[in-house]
Every structure is written in C-alpha cells, then in structure tokens.
Amino acid sequence: RRSSDLMNRLTDKSTDFNPELTVKDDMTALREIAGRLSRHPEVESVCISQNSIPYNEGCSGASFRFPDNDTVWISTMDRWTTPEYYKVFRFRNIDGSGHESLVKALEKNTIIVPVDVADYYPDATFHGKDLLGKEVRMSDTNFRIAALTEPVRYDHYNIAGKPFTGTYIGTYLSDEQMETVENVAYLELSLRVREGVDDGFVERLMNDADRIYQVGNVYILDVTPLSKVRTASEIDNDNELRTQFCILFFLLLNIFLGVIGTFWFRTQQRRGEVALRMAMGANRKNIFYRLITEGLLLLSMSALPAVLIAFNIGYTELVDISQMAFTVPRFLIAILLTYLLMAIMIILGVLYPALQSMKVQPAEALRDE
C-alpha cells in the first residue's frame, strides 16, 4: 500500500516557528523527515517528488531530442523524483530486474523513460529497446537514458504510449533543485508500507507526527492513501462509465425485446406451415432446426453490411478511441460477441413458439388456418 504525505511549513503564528530558518533549511528538514520515515519499522521505502505522484490532477512537462535530430522533440510528463520513487510505486524494468535496478539507474546525468516513450513520434531516431543507453538533449544539457520501464498509464481511463496519458521522462530531483521549489508544500513525500501492516498505520503515524516528524519549520500536515487519491481523481470518469452502462442496458433491453418479439411473432404466424410439414412426415427436430437456421441466416445476411459500416466508423475514428485504441483484434472480438448476443436473442425468440407449435396436432392447426 502506498500513501502520500502532505507537507507544510509553520507560519509566524505558530509558537514553534523559527524565522531564522531559510528555504535551504526547510529542504534539509524535509529530507530528514524522509529519512526518519524510511527507518520506521512499518515503512518499506520513501521518496520525494514534485508533481509526480500517480493520479495527480496536474503534471509538469519535459522534452528531449536526439543529438542528430533537432526537428523532433519528444514531449511528455516530467517525473521529477528521487530514485526511490520507482521502488515506492513499483515500476518494472523491461529487462526483468525489477525496481531496484531503476533506483540505481537514476542519477543527476541520467533519465528513465518507458519503452514506448517515442512510439507516438514516428520520425524519432530511436524507438523501443533501441532507446537504452542513448544520449539525449534536454534544454542545454545532455542526459543518458539509463533504463527503460514497462509501459504505464496515467490512470485507468487512459491508454499507454501517448504523451501526458502514459509516457513520462523520469528526471533526478537533486537537493539544489528542491530549493528552487522554495516551499515544501509544493513537494510530495510518498511512502510504501510493508506487507501485512494493518489499516491503523496512518493514525499511528499522525500520533507521532508532532513529536518525531516535525523538523524546524517543516511538519506533516496529513497522510492520504493513494487509493483515496485515485478515487478522487477518477470519480468523474467512474460516474460517466456508470451512466454509459445504464444507457447500454436500456438499449440492450429494447433490442432484446424487439428481436425476440419479431421472431416470436414470425414463428407464431407459421403454425400452419409447421403443421403441414408434420403432416407430410417431417419430424419435430428437423422443423425446429430449420426455424433456427432461418433466423441465423437472416442474422448473417444483415451482419455483413453492418460489419463494413462498423469497421469504417472505427477506422475513421468517428467514435472515441482515446481510452482504447481501435485494433483489428478488438474489432473482431466485438463483432463476435455482438453476433453471439444477437444469435441468442433470435434463438430465444424462435424457441418457445416453435416448441408450442410442434405440440399442436396437424389437423387442429390446419383447421385453425
């Protein structure tokens, strides 16, 4: 489990406020608090970052280019962090070495990027695993790509591989750079608790906050589990998804009743035909299969133009594909599921009236006709 500590600075209204402490002293105090937290028996790892925690409402941007290509700048989110960030949030190295190698890879002259960071830019010099070890230019400084992580997403409602929705540039947050932020409230202190720690950890930590985790003018204002940050960040998308599911259920119910009703009425109207076939020697099983086959044949004939129309709608991006890319496998799966759903509706619409028709004696059905 991960938590984010909200840091703050005492004001002159507090009796503990020391007006002689500078910004540099505040940042030193923040690092001291991070060190004390890392030694807590229930804490696994601690990191400091700036505008970089997952599900954060805002983000910073960064760009780099390759030295031999000054026309293509790869722009995306800037993950400005201390190395332990990759341990706290469990980023995975593509070489299978886990997060420990990422912690060692991030230094002042290196960056870490996901393996798909350049996929959005087809004219970039390098892509994929070829990025590893390459020199890049950021502002007026050269950096080396020291490690590649597996693709990540900004949240559950975005796809990986696109700028500001998944890809990022992981840069080193040095002591000097922390001082340029000036206020500890603009920095994030995140920690991961050990496995098996109960839900009372936050309460126990805050009980010790004033005694142990206040250094100089810097103190812990609040501790927020990342699950709550995620809920707050995704609540609008969650509500929209629920609304869409309600609309989808309503439409499916109407389609379900319409298709079943149509084939029910159609089969009911053919009672005389069923009786005549039975009178001519056809058995019930063959008649039933014939009615089902006719329904599925009508479905297949209407499905062909529907598939062509649906493919063109997706291919031309007339529908929203920002949250899930339009791919051939996805399209085929959707078509197959739709066909099966419609087939079930048709079978249900034919099943009961067909069985009822076959129970009627041929002479009685012909007399009714």
Name each region found by the language model.
Residues 257-294, 359-368:
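Intracellular coupling helices
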Residues 213-248, 269, 314-337:
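Membrane-helix entry/capping segments
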Residues 338-369:
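C-terminal membrane-exit region of the final transmembrane helix in multipass inner-membrane proteins
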Residues 1-4, 237-272, 297-309, 341-348:
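Hydrophobic alpha-helical transmembrane segments of multi-pass inner-membrane transport and secretion
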Residues 51-232:
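Mid-to-C-terminal secondary-structure elements
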Residues 4-73, 78-79:
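Membrane-proximal extracellular/periplasmic loop immediately following the first transmembrane helix
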Residues 1-17, 273, 361-369:
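Alpha-helical transmembrane segments of integral membrane proteins
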Residues 251, 272-318, 333-337, 341, ...:
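Transmembrane alpha-helical interface segments in multi-pass membrane proteins
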